[in-house]
Amino acid sequence: MRTISDLPVALVEEILSRVPLTSLSAVRSTCKTWNALSKTQIFGKTRQQFLGFMMIDFGLYSIKFDLQGLNYESDFVEPSIKRVSILDQLDIFKVFHCEGLLLCVFRGNRWPVVWNPYLGGTGWIQPISDFHKYQVSDKFAFGYENKNRNYKILRFLRYFFGFYDIYDLNSSAWKVLDVNPDCDIKCGVSLKGKTYFFAKEIAKAPNVKDFLVCFDFTAERFGPRLPLPFHSCGLFSEHVTLSCVRDEHLAVLYRRYNGVMEIYITTKIEPNEVFWSNFLKVDLTTFPDRFYGSRSHYFFIDEEKKVAVVFKNEPEWTMDCSYQTAYIIGKGGYLKSVKFGETPNDRKHNNAWNINSFMLSSYVPSLVQL
């Protein structure tokens, strides 16, 4: 009698390519062959397509975005998006990614959870005391020690008071840190176990300097201020956001007040040193109003295709539905828009998008057990 382990490898690979990222843990238990092929499939695909997570209306969605057929309309694969059901009963407020693990922070005083989407394991993070209960104003960073990959969570407890503590996943223990970056920290991303933040000087406009600052989870300290390839004026019409490039480089998007969008990528980055290269510069005033009119953007880049895929932080609407749009932007004014994540405008959904909960994070699967 034939079994599923007898199926041709090419057929199994085709099946696995259609399985949502969060369902692969069930596939892995099917048989040894499927387990091995799922690892090859998923780790190989991360080099060919964008795998990531997007947060919309306090829900988490896995997303696949393949640019392989970009130059040939008939071969272009539309992005797929699927809601993550494992966390459906809780409203997710923030998500932080570090090399295959997700730190999910919920609305209210619920404990955060670290989740491995590939293996399916979870670990809940208990506060040290009632005084340390989680607040909406708390900020987080997620990283690990260099030598043993011991994962840690940094929290800015009521960050405007300059109170910082750190959680060690191995020992399940919190401790207070005597650190002070002496700056206004905005957004951050994890790269090679460290977290790099876009930050501004605590000073009055218009002489506010902006820069990067790194938190090293091995030393448990903030590093020196690192230069950016631009200077933002701090105007409401400006926007700065960070993104990782295959967990190897850092990219920064800067939208100027005059509508010019610039994207830079690091050629070298360490806690005390950074070098930048210009990746893309476009004038958004020549683009459709629905894109130009959006102030905030989230993005990832494809170095091989030399394009940026940019998402607005709010949906677009029709009489019947709402949907998200990805804009593929290249040099010479190249622009392609792709719709996905359609939601009907009925009483059940009630136009349920929430622009404050939009998040985009690339994903590389992890074999870390929780």
From Swiss-Prot:
User: Start and end of every F-box domain?
Assistant: 1-46
Entries under InterPro entries matching the protein: A_thaliana_F-box, F-box-assoc_dom_typ1, F-box-assoc_interact_dom, F-box-like_dom_sf, F-box_dom
Lineage top rank: taxon? Eukaryota
Q: Which PROSITE patterns match?
A: FBOX
- One of its Pfam families is FBA_1
UniProt cross-references to NCBIfam families, sorted A to Z: F_box_assoc_1
Q: What is this protein called?
A: F-box protein At1g66490
According to its UniProt entry, this protein's organism is Arabidopsis thaliana
